[in-house]
UniProtKB/Swiss-Prot annotation:
Name the UniProt record assigns to this protein: Uncharacterized PPE family protein PPE21
SUPFAM superfamilies: PE/PPE dimer-like (SSF140459)
Keywords recorded for this protein, A-Z: Cell membrane, Membrane, Transmembrane, Transmembrane helix
Signal sequence coordinates: none
GO annotation, biological process: response to host immune response
The encoding gene: PPE21
Transmembrane segments: 14-34, 180-200
Origin superkingdom: Bacteria
Pfam families found in the cross-reference section: Pentapeptide_2, PPE
Topological category with respect to the lipid bilayer: Multi-pass membrane protein
Organism classification: Bacteria, Bacillati, Actinomycetota, Actinomycetes, Mycobacteriales
C-alpha cells in the first residue's frame, strides 16, 4: 500500500480505529506461556524417559524408545525456543504500533483543521481570508507528512518483525498425516463415511483450524493473520471477506469497516465503489445512501455532486430535480433557483419556460407572476394555466401551488401528476407520487429511479430505502435483484436473499462468494458457514468438495453432501450443477454456463431463496407465469417479470399488492400508476 497518497483523514483513522495493541499483547503473553510450558514439558519428558531407560526397562524396545523420545524432546525444546521468539516478535510489533500511534496525528485534529478550512472558505467573499486559508493548508500538509512518516516507519518495522519469524518445525509425527500437515488440538484426520473432520492447518502459527495460511487466530482462512473466519486475504477482523484489512464481513475488496461492500474503504454497507460513507451506493466518494454516481451528499441521487435527494443530474442542491445545477425542488431543466420550474434559468416557483423571475409564468424572460407570453413585466392571473385550483400554477388541471406540470395535487411539481388519491410535492417526474421524486412512476420520497416504491432509491423497480441497484426489495442494496439489506452482488446474474452479501445468488448473510447457502462464506457453492473453499458442505473448510469440518484439502469427488443428481453440488438432494442448499433443480438448457441455485426447493437457474420457480429470482415463492424464462424478481410471492416487493402480479412493478404493468405503490389495478388504489 502506498501510504503517501492517502490523506491524513484516512491514515489517522486507520491507526486510531480497531482494537489497538491489546490483542497483540495478549498474543505475546500466550506465546510466552506456551514457551514456558513446552520447555517444562521437554525437561520433564527427558527426565522420565532417562529414568526408565537406566532403570528397570532394558533391551531393544528400551533402546528404540530412547531414540524416539530423544527426538521428541529435541522437538519440544526447539518449539519452546520458537514460541519464545514469537513472543518477542509480538512484543516488538506492539512497540512498533505504539510508536507509530504516538507519531500519528489524532483524527480530531485533522477534522478540526478541515472544519476551520471550510469556515474560512465559506466566509471568503472578498478574499480577505486568503492568508488564513494558506496557513491552515500548511498545517494540513504537515499533518499529511507526519502521518506518512509514521505509517512508513510502522510498515518497515512490522515487515522486519514478520521476516524475522522462523516457521515452526513439524513434529516427528507430521510425516504420517496427509500432505505433511501438523495436526493440532489432538484432532486426527477422521473418516466417517464421506464426512471428514480435519484438525490441521497447511502452514504454521495458526490458533484456529483448517487454515491455508499462517498466524490466523480464526479458522478456514485462505491467507494470513486473519482474526475472523473463512476469509480469502490477509489481516481481516471480520469473516467471509475476499480481500484484506476488512473490519466487517462479506466484503469483496480491502479496508472496509462495513459489510457487504464491493470496493475499498467504504464506511457503511452494501456499496459498490470506494470511499463511501453510507450504504447502498453505486459509485465512490458519496456521503449518504442509495446514490448512483460519485461525490453526492444525500440519498437516492442519480448523478454527481448533488446535495439532497432524488435528483437526476449533477450539482443540484435540493430534492427531485431533473437537470443540473438547480437550487430547489422539483425542477426540470438547468440552473433554476426555486421549485417546480419547467425550463432553465428560472428564479422563482412554478414557471413554465426559461429565464423567468417570479411565480407561475408561462413563457420566457418574464418578471412577475401569472404572465402568459414572453418578455413581460407585471402581474397576470393567479394561475396562467387552465383548470387550476390554487395559486401560481402555469400547468393545467392542478390543485395546489406553483405547479408547472399538469394534473398535480400538491406544490412545486414540474412533472405531470397521476390524479386523485396521489399527492405530489417538489417532483419533476411524470406520474410520480410523493415528495422530491425525479424518477417516473415512483411512489415515495427522493426517488430518482423509475417505478420505485420507498425512499431515496436511485435505481428502477426497487421497493425499500436507499437502493442504487435495480429490482431490489429491502434497504441499502447496490446490486441487482436482491432481497434483504446491504447486498452489493448480483449485477451480472441474480442478487442474494439475506444481509450484506457482496457475491451473487446467495441465500444467507455476509457471503463474499457466490451461490452459497449459509453465512460468512468467501468461497463458492458452499452449504454451511465460514467456508473459504468451494463446493463444501459443512463448516470452516478451506479446501474444496469437503463434507465436514475444518478441512484444508481438496477431495477427489463430484459433489459434497448427500443424494445429489449431477455434479458440483453441495448440500442435500440437489439435481443439476452448481447448486447449494436443499432439493434444488437447475435446468440444463444453458449448461455451457455456470447455472445453479442456493436455498431450498428452487426450480430454474440463478435463484436465491425458497421455492422460487423460473430464472433470476431472489426471495420467497416468486415465479413467472410461463414457468420458464428470465424473471428478474425480488421479494415475496410475486408473479411476472421485473418485480420487487410483495404480492404483485404483472411486469415492471414495485410495492405491495399491485395488479398490472408499470406500477409502483400499493393496491393499484391500473397500468402506469403510482401511489395508492388506482
Amino acid at each position: 500500500m502506498n501510504f503517501s497518497v492517502l490523506p491524513p483523514e484516512i491514515n489517522s483513522a486507520l491507526m486510531f480505529a480497531g482494537a489497538g495493541p491489546g490483542p497483540m499483547l495478549a498474543a505475546a503473553s500466550a506465546w510466552t506461556g506456551l514457551a514456558g510450558d513446552l520447555g517444562s514439558a521437554a525437561a520433564s519428558f527427558s527426565a522420565v524417559t532417562s529414568q526408565l531407560a537406566t532403570g528397570s526397562w532394558q533391551g531393544p524396545a528400551s533402546a528404540a524408545m530412547t531414540g524416539v523420545a530423544a527426538s521428541y524432546a529435541r522437538w519440544l525444546t526447539t518449539a519452546a525456543a520458537q514460541a519464545e521468539q514469537a513472543a518477542g516478535q509480538a512484543q516488538a510489533a506492539v512497540s512498533a504500533f505504539e510508536a507509530a500511534l504516538a507519531a500519528t496525528v489524532h483524527p480530531g485534529a485533522v477534522s478540526a483543521n478541515r472544519g476551520r478550512l471550510r469556515s474560512l472558505v465559506a466566509s471568503n467573499l472578498l478574499g480577505q481570508n486568503a492568508p488564513a486559508i494558506a496557513a491552515v493548508e500548511a498545517v494540513y500538509e504537515q499533518m499529511w507528512a507526519a502521518d506518512v512518516a509514521a505509517m512508513l516507519g510502522y510498515h518497515g518495522e512490522a515487515s522486519a518483525v514478520a521476516l524475522s519469524l522462523t516457521p515452526f518445525t513439524p513434529s516427528p509425527s507430521a510425516a504420517a498425516t496427509p500432505g505433511g500437515a501438523v495436526i493440532i488440538a489432538g484432532f486426527p484426520f477422521l473418516d466417517l463415511g464421506n464426512v471428514t473432520i480435519g484438525g490441521f492447518n497447511l502452514a504454521s502459527g495458526n490458533l484456529g483450524l483448517g487454515n491455508l495460511g499462517s498466524f490466523n487466530p480464526g479458522s478456514a482462512n485462505t491467507g494470513s493473520v486473519n482474526l475472523g473466519n473463512a476469509n480469502i486475504g490477509d489481516l481481516n477482523l471480520g469473516s467471509g471477506n475476499i480481500g484484506s484489512y476488512n473490519l466487517g464481513g462479506g466484503n469483496t475488496g480491502d479496508l472496509n469497516p462495513g459489510s457487504g461492500n464491493t470496493g475499498t474503504l467504504n464506511w457503511g454497507s452494501g456499496n459498490i465503489g470506494s470511499y463511501n460513507l453510507g450504504g447502498g451506493n453505486l459509485g465512490s466518494y458519496n456521503l449518504g445512501s442509495g446514490n448512483t454516481g460519485d461525490t453526492n451528499f444525500g440519498g437516492g441521487n442519480t448523478g454527481n455532486l448533488n446535495v439532497g435527494g432524488g435528483n437526476t443530474g449533477n450539482s443540484n442542491f435540493g430534492f427531485g430535480n431533473t437537470g443540473n445545477v438547480n437550487f430547489g425542488n422539483g425542477n426540470t431543466g438547468d440552473t433554476n433557483f426555486g421549485s417546480g420550474n419547467l425550463g432553465s434559468g428560472n428564479i422563482g416557483f412554478g414557471n413554465k419556460g426559461s429565464h423567468n423571475i417570479g411565480f407561475g409564468n408561462s413563457g420566457n424572460n418574464n418578471i412577475g407572476f401569472g404572465l402568459t407570453g414572453d418578455n413581460q413585466i407585471g402581474f397576470g392571473a393567479l394561475n396562467s394555466g387552465s383548470g387550476n385550483l390554487g395559486f401560481g400554477n402555469s400547468g393545467n388541471g392542478n390543485i395546489g401551488f406553483f405547479n408547472s406540470g399538469n394534473n398535480n395535487i400538491g406544490m412545486g411539481n414540474s412533472g405531470n401528476g397521476v390524479g386523485a388519491l396521489s399527492v405530489e410535492f417538489g417532483s419533476s417526474a411524470e406520474r410520480s407520487s410523493g415528495f422530491g421524486n425525479s424518477g417516473e412512476l415512483s411512489t415515495g420520497i427522493g426517488n430518482s429511479g423509475q417505478l420505485s416504491t420507498g425512499w431515496f432509491n436511485s435505481a428502477t423497480t426497487s421497493t425499500g430505502w436507499f437502493n442504487s441497484g435495480t429490482t431490489n426489495t429491502g434497504w441499502f442494496n447496490s446490486g441487482t435483484t436482491n432481497t434483504g439489506i446491504g447486498n452489493s452482488g448480483g449485477n451480472l446474474v441474480t442478487g442474494s436473499m439475506g444481509l450484506f452479501n457482496s457475491g451473487h445468488t446467495n441465500t444467507g448473510s455476509f457471503n463474499a462468494g457466490s451461490m452459497n447457502t449459509g453465512d460468512f462464506n468467501s468461497g463458492n457453492v458452499n452449504t454451511g458457514y465460514f467456508n473459504s473453499g468451494n463446493i463444501n458442505t459443512g463448516f470452516f473448510n478451506s479446501g474444496d468438495l469437503n463434507t465436514g469440518l475444518f478441512n484444508s484439502v481438496n477431495q477427489p469427488v463430484q459433489n459434497s453432501g448427500w443424494l445429489h443428481t449431477g455434479t458440483n453440488n453441495s448440500g442435500y438432494a440437489n439435481a443439476g450443477t452448481f447448486n447449494s442448499g436443499f432439493d434444488n433443480n437447475a435446468r440444463d438448457e444453458h449448461a455451457e454456463f455456470v447455472t445453479g441455485n442456493s436455498g431450498l426447493a428452487n426450480v430454474g437457474n440463478y435463484n436465491a431463496g425458497i421455492i422460487n420457480v423460473g430464472d433470476h429470482l431472489s426471495g420467497f415463492r416468486n415465479s413467472v407465469p410461463t414457468i420458464t424464462g428470465t424473471a428478474n424478481i425480488s421479494g415475496f410471492v410475486n408473479a411476472g417479470t421485473s418485480i420487487s416487493g410483495f404480492f404483485n402480479f404483472g411486469s415492471l412493478m414495485s410495492g405491495f399488492a399491485n395488479f398490472d404493468d408499470e406500477v409502483s405503490g400499493y393496491l393499484n389495478g391500473d397500468s402506469r400508476a403510482s401511489g395508492w388504489i388506482h
